[in-house]
Amino acid sequence: MQKALLVIDLQNDYFPGGNFELWNTSNVLQNTLKAIEKAKQQGVAIVLVQHIANPANGVSPFFNEGSKGVDIHPAILAAAPEAPIVIKRFADSFEATELEAKLTQLGTKEILVCGMMTQNCVTHTAISRAAEKYKTSILTDCCTTVSEIFHMIALGAVATRMTLQTSAEAF
């Protein structure tokens, strides 16, 4: 069964010095880097997802095209330099993107979802209608949001619909 690790929105604006710093980003970054390394060792495809705010909607609080904050964190790019990058403008990484085509091209049957923010882009991607054809898991230690409580609430909300596991359990 071909697996793919989806790394969603690990972008500079969510880290210290960014426009919308999240909770626990250092630990999540380290856990995600370990997951990427294990994925590479096990032949699991890696797909990076980058949110770019739609300029037609005016200036966004973060992820504005051309800003430093919109860039994927350099450690992620260094860890997965060959990974395709899917650009999105919505919380659901499948909506109006090439993600589904990329996963089909890779022969993907299972997706391991991680990233930022847990209650938004991570869960919206994991519960997307387009994700229904995949065995879907969220890597709980490779996700974060504005606070621990929001993170836990978001994971609890999708717990009956998919597997929640740590990256160590997944790999």
What are these regions (language model features)?
Residues 1-10:
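Short coil-to-beta-strand
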Residues 3-4, 31-42, 61-171:
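Active-site-adjacent betaalpha module
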Residues 14-18, 55-59:
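A short acidic, helix-capping loop that chelates divalent metal ions and anchors anionic groups
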Residues 19-25, 60-65:
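Short glycine-enriched, charge-decorated loop/helix-capping segments at active-site entrances
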